[in-house]
């Protein structure tokens, strides 16, 4: 398994252990993780702390030229809000663990020039499948339903 996706899965598991939604993300520059995060909507009582947003926040302020050389990894297909952040900061590549349990606007992100790779990783799929089955009400809240 890709080491960076594995790091994102570790973040997702941390979030689950904290009582949150198991989605994780890492930001990679030149083969090094420069930001990592997990969904913290429950833990922080936040409407915006999705994994990707938390990851970008934890990377701190970076020059635009840095984002433009990064790869963002996420265990689940990013939602419209997080996809917007990818486009805003011109992150050129997104690697997603899976999009079977939820699919964000991947085609739109691609149409804006971002290389989107969906791995359909069994661990990512199962982690979300188990969570959705156990906590469907919380999951539906997270995706705005």
Predicted regions and their residues:
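A short, polar/charged loop-to-alpha-helix boundary motif
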Residues: 43-54
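A short helix-loop-beta-strand connector motif used in the catalytic cores of GNAT acetyltransferases and
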Residues: 17-23
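Short beta-strand scaffold segments in enzyme catalytic cores
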Residues: 23-31
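Short beta->alpha transition motifs characteristic of CBS
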Residues: 34-41
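Zinc-dependent deaminase
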Residues: 1-15, 68, 78, 87-145
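Mobile, glycine- and charge-enriched loop segments
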Residues: 52-76
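Short cysteine clusters
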Residues: 55, 79-82, 86
